Structures are given as structure tokens and as C-alpha cells.
């Protein structure tokens, strides 16, 4: 039997948190501290990295987080400032209140400091409240200027830290400012700094009507793919389901694009197992990602590229199926 040198796997720490929605306002489980979540991530057994929301839960110190990560054998890949909570319900970068914008910038500067302290790869910027809900609500010119200028100021003040923008079409805003791969790349071009890139969420690309593989290629071609998250959904909402449960072929194409471009990075989960066991959901996800990795090893890439050159979809599918389905016969 072949042995495989699998990639490193990671997860957003929220994978192990408690969730609420607009119906179950009392939550789907007990409140869990940052330390509790790190300990749960440890139970998965095959995670190397976690992305940590910041600030940490009340009462948890940076020193305690460092100790917990060390004890769990985990490292921080990113810090995600929570610039989407109640305080910034009208926006972070684009809030009409200058004081609210200043408070958001302060939190993001603090997050850059945490990245340095933990040796993480980047600050993940997900400005979920930046955008609008109604026609005529905003000046699109002014809103875009606030978003782009704000990112430029933030990244320019922290040139030693990478900032990865995670785009998404909508939710919580009806329309988010950073809503697509193309728009995010245009904004990064306007920003004009090397330390600003993209964190590509597979589910956000699906939900936005994109091909995640196509989006990945677009971003890689411009040297801006700083990180990625995988999950799954039914394309009508950001369901954050367990990866591979719906779009198996498209997730394979996504990782194929990463492979042929020699993109080296953590294979990271961004999932919300509301009703499922959090640890088991992560373990099942990693099991599937290992299947994908083995399938990439089996894939006849020259034959596939010849089929693609001829734009022969049936031949391409035959080659893909031979690799993808045969990889699943190996038990985990």
C-alpha cells in the first residue's frame, strides 16, 4: 500500500464553538471559552493549525492561549478580528460613524500584534457588516473608497503582517462590499500593497455563483492567494456543511488547481456543525480531504490536460472519475 505525505490540516476555532441563529437564540449548546475550543480541536487528532477569533472569550489571556495551543500541539494560522459584532452592525471600514471606524481599526491593529505574538500567517479580514441592504442606501463611490482606503491604511501601518480579505456575496449584510474574487482583486490592485491578499472560502465562491477552481486560478495568477477554507453548501446559502458532502467533483477541481500551481498551504476547515458533534465533523472532513489528496496523486494529469486542451468534457470526466472514485476504496 502506498504511503502518503498528507498536507497539514487546520480549522477555524469557531468549528468547536457554540452557535446561535435567529431562531435558536439560546444557542445549540453550552457557551465555550477560547480554551475550551482549543481543547476540543486537540481531540480531532489530525489538526495542526487553528484560526482564532479575536478578542478571545472574556477572561482568557494571550498567555493562556499560548499555553493551551502548545499543550494541544496546535499553531495559529490566522487571527480573525471580530469586526462584525453588534458594535459594528452598520459596518467596520464603511461605518458612517468615524468613531466606530476608529474602534474597528484599533481592534485590527491589536490583531496584527497577536499575529506577531503567536507567529501566525496573517490577519484574516472578514468585514461582514460592510455593505448595504437597500437601493439608494449608500453612495457606492464613497463606500468603496472607505473600504479600499481603510485596508490600505491598515496594511500600510503593519507592513510586516499579511492581511487576507475573505470575500462573501452577502450575510449578514444583504450585499457585502467585498463580494467576489474579481471585485476583491480589483480592490487589492487599488490598495497597491504586497501584504494584502485573499482568503478564498470554497463555500463563499459556490454561494456567489463562482467556480471555486476558476476563482482560485484568478487569484493565484496575481500572487494573492494567502489562504483558503473549505466546506460545502447547497449554493443557495452559506451553509458551511462538512466538506465533500455535496460538491465532491468541484472540490476535487479546486484542489487540482492548487496542485498544478504548486500552491503550498494549510488545508483548512471553515464549518459550522450546528447539530453535529464538532470533533466528529472535523474528523470526517479530514478523512474526505485525505481521499482528495490520494485522488490527486492518482490523477493522470497529462491525459486530463490533453482532454482540456481539446475541451472534451466526457473524456475529462472519465479521467477525473477514475482517480476520484478509486481513491475512496482506501479505508481510513
Swiss-Prot record:
Reaction catalysed by this enzyme: aldehydo-D-apiose = apulose
Domain of life, per lineage: Bacteria
UniProt cofactor note: Binds 2 magnesium ions per subunit.
InterPro entries to which the protein is assigned, alphabetical: IolE/XylAMocC-like, Xyl_isomerase-like_sf, Xyl_isomerase-like_TIM-brl, Xylose_isomerase
Keyword RNA-binding: no
EC numbers: 5.3.1.36
Assigned protein family: Belongs to the xylose isomerase family.
Function: Involved in catabolism of D-apiose. Catalyzes isomerization of D-apiose to apulose.
The protein, known as: D-apiose isomerase
Species: Pectobacterium atrosepticum (strain SCRI 1043 / ATCC BAA-672) (Erwinia carotovora subsp. atroseptica)
Amino acid at each position: 500500500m502506498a504511503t502518503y505525505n498528507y498536507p497539514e490540516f487546520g480549522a477555524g476555532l469557531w468549528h468547536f464553538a457554540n452557535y446561535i441563529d435567529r431562531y435558536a437564540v439560546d444557542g445549540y449548546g453550552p457557551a465555550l471559552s477560547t480554551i475550551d475550543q482549543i481543547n476540543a480541536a486537540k481531540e480531532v487528532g489530525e489538526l495542526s493549525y487553528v484560526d482564532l477569533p479575536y478578542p478571545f472569550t472574556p477572561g482568557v489571556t494571550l498567555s493562556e492561549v499560548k499555553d493551551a495551543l502548545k499543550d494541544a500541539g496546535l499553531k495559529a494560522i490566522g487571527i480573525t478580528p471580530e469586526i462584525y459584532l453588534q458594535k459594528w452592525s452598520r459596518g467596520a471600514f464603511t461605518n458612517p460613524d468615524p468613531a466606530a471606524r476608529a474602534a474597528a481599526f484599533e481592534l485590527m491593529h491589536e490583531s496584527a500584534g497577536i499575529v506577531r505574538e503567536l507567529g501566525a500567517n496573517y490577519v484574516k479580514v472578514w468585514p461582514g457588516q460592510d455593505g448595504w441592504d437597500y437601493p439608494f442606501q449608500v453612495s457606492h463611490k464613497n463606500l468603496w473608497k472607505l473600504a479600499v482606503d481603510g485596508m490600505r491604511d491598515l496594511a500600510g501601518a503593519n507592513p510586516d503582517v499579511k492581511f487576507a480579505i475573505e470575500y462573501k456575496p452577502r450575510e449578514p449584510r444583504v450585499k457585502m462590499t467585498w463580494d467576489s474574487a474579481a471585485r476583491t482583486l480589483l480592490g487589492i490592485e487599488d490598495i497597491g500593497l504586497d501584504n494584502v491578499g485573499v482568503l478564498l472560502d470554497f463555500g463563499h465562491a459556490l454561494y456567489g455563483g463562482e467556480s471555486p477552481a476558476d476563482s482560485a486560478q484568478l487569484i493565484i495568477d496575481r500572487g494573492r492567494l494567502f489562504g483558503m477554507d473549505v466546506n460545502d453548501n447547497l449554493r443557495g446559502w452559506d451553509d458551511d456543511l462538512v466538506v465533500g458532502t455535496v460538491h465532491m467533483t468541484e472540490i476535487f477541481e479546486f484542489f487540482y488547481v492548487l496542485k498544478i500551481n504548486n500552491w503550498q498551504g494549510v488545508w483548512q476547515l471553515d464549518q459550522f456543525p450546528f447539530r453535529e458533534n464538532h470533533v466528529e465533523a472535523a474528523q470526517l472532513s479530514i478523512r474526505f480531504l485525505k481521499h482528495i489528496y490520494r485522488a490527486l496523486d492518482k490523477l493522470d494529469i497529462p491525459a486530463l490536460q490533453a482532454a482540456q486542451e481539446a475541451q472534451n468534457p466526457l473524456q475529462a470526466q472519465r479521467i477525473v472519475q477514475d482517480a476520484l472514485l478509486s481513491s475512496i476504496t482506501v479505508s481510513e
